[in-house]
Every structure is written in structure tokens, then in C-alpha cells.
Amino acid sequence: MIFQRTVKEMVKTTGVGLHSGNKVTLTIKPAPINTGIVLMRTDLNPAVAIPAKANMVRETTMCTALVNDEGVRISTIEHLFAALAGLGIDNAVIEVDAPEIPIMDGSASPFVFLLQSAGIQEQSAPKKYLRIKRTVRVEDGDKWAEIRPFQGFRVNFAIDFNHPEIARSQQHMVMDFSSTAFVKDISRARTFGFMRDIEYLRANNLALGGSMENAVVLDEYRVLNPDGLRYEDEFVKHKILDAFGDLYVAGHAIIGEFCAYKTGHALNNQLVRAVLAAQDAWELVSFDKEADAPVSFAMPGNAVFA
């Protein structure tokens, strides 16, 4: 039987909020079977819990944000969720003392390290996978995203930026998912942005915590970060990282192929909602044997380092 997973121990870190620029403390705690991922705002009295569900994603400008019916929000969840998805964590309580998850270095790698430091605990209930039975597609102008049946989890992603540095890099990638491939090839890819946008963002109280410490920054011609890129194709890899996180609000690891062109947080969430709404397009499945599961996660205790 392939079992659900949580973290073995509580683990905590502190970072900066990308949009607020303020210090944020993040705590990850174990959770019982069938809890899912629950985020909690501990700076509010009483604390407010927000379950990580597709219909709770109500803001997708510059990041993915969960917002409850009372307007309480937790923003910038996508990199943490990519790490949770990449390591196959089904159940956890995520406490944060601010309206956003800390940006850390702009990638999922610090969250992978945090989860591996906490340890991964198998639980007593079977892990449920969301298996795609028919293709579901969403479009917005020339942008599109779809998910189709596939015996595994594959990502086929293309970006198209009219920028000389990005144009020089590979802008299309196909990846068959495994925990090892995610940690080594995707998790360290950082978010990126353009100098020309920063003034506008800061005038709107966004990206106040953004810097070359937590993003790849480009001017009109080149990457400005002194150390350059972590991967030659870091741009498309970061978009794949974002997609991993955005898709995980489906509540389960996906068995299918995610194909996308120029998609972002908004279209990713639209796709998840469209899939869940089309009840004939998917089914929940479990597996008795590791060898039978088409999606592979590293075994607990076997840390995979980038």
C-alpha cells in the first residue's frame, strides 16, 4: 500500500514577505490522515484556518493567494506548495504570522530543505491520486493549459518572452515527474522579473521585499544578478515550479499530462477548477504496491538534495 504522508516533526523558518517586505515566520506541523494542507494565520485573534482548495484561490495577480469568505488571505503559496507536491506531502498544517508566505530565495529549494529537515512520516491511510480520464482544456487569448490522460505525471510547458536573454534560453521543456527530478532539476529555479516593472509594482505596494536575493532580475538586455542563472533554462523551469504548486490545490497528486503555453497562476487555477467540476474527467485511485503507482515519490528518510 502507498500511504499518505505528513512531516515527522514541527519545523520553523523566518523570511521576508515578497510583497510586504516584512519579516514572516512560517511553521509546518504534522497533521492527521485526510486533513490535506491547511494554512493558518496565527497573527489574527482568533487564528484563522484556510484549507488549501482550488475554490479558495481568489487572487492570482503576481502570485497565488488563498482568500476565505471573510476576506482573510494568505498570498504567495505556490513555491511552498511546489515543495509539498514534489515530496508527496498529503497532510500538514502551515502556520504563518502574516498575510503571505515568506519568499525565501525565490525558489522552492528552501522549503524542500525545511521539509526534509522535518522528516517525512508515512501514515495509516492509503494515498489518493487524482487520475485524469479525459482531456480538459482552458484558454485565454493565445495562452492555454490542458491536462490529459497519461500513465504518470508529465509536464510539457512552453513560454514565449520577447527578451534577448530569455529568448537565448530554452523556452520549452518536457519533464516526467519524480521527486528526484523535481528536487534536482526544478526546485532551485527562482522567480524572475523585469526592472521596468518594479517601479509600477512598488507604487502599488507590491514586491516591496523583492531583490536579487530572491529573484532573477532582468533589464532590457540581460540578467543583472552578479551570479547569473542557476540553470541555463531557469525561466521555463520556474514556470513549471509555479505550475506544480498551483496544481496542488487540487488536493492530490495528479496522474496525467499537464500541457501549457504561456500560462500563469490564473490559468493554472482555472484548469484545476475546470477539472474538478468535470466529474467524468477524473477519479481518485490508490495503489497497493509501490511498483503499481505511475507517479514516483522518494521514500521517507531518503533525502534528495539539489
UniProtKB/Swiss-Prot annotation:
The active site is at H265. Signal peptide: none annotated. Zn(2+) binds at H79, H238, D242. Its EC number is 3.5.1.108. Pathway: Glycolipid biosynthesis; lipid IV(A) biosynthesis; lipid IV(A) from (3R)-3-hydroxytetradecanoyl-[acyl-carrier-protein] and UDP-N-acetyl-alpha-D-glucosamine: step 2/6. Pfam families: LpxC (PF03331). It comes from the Bacteria. One of its GO terms (cellular component) is membrane. Keywords: Hydrolase, Lipid A biosynthesis, Lipid biosynthesis, Lipid metabolism, Metal-binding, Zinc. One of its GO terms (biological process) is lipid A biosynthetic process. The keyword DNA damage does not apply. Coiled coil: none annotated. Its cofactor is Zn(2+). GO terms for molecular function: metal ion binding; UDP-3-O-acyl-N-acetylglucosamine deacetylase activity. Catalyzes the hydrolysis of UDP-3-O-myristoyl-N-acetylglucosamine to form UDP-3-O-myristoylglucosamine and acetate, the committed step in lipid A biosynthesis. PANTHER family: UDP-3-O-ACYL-N-ACETYLGLUCOSAMINE DEACETYLASE 1, MITOCHONDRIAL-RELATED. Belongs to the LpxC family. NCBIfam families: lpxC. This is UDP-3-O-acyl-N-acetylglucosamine deacetylase. It comes from Shewanella amazonensis (strain ATCC BAA-1098 / SB2B).
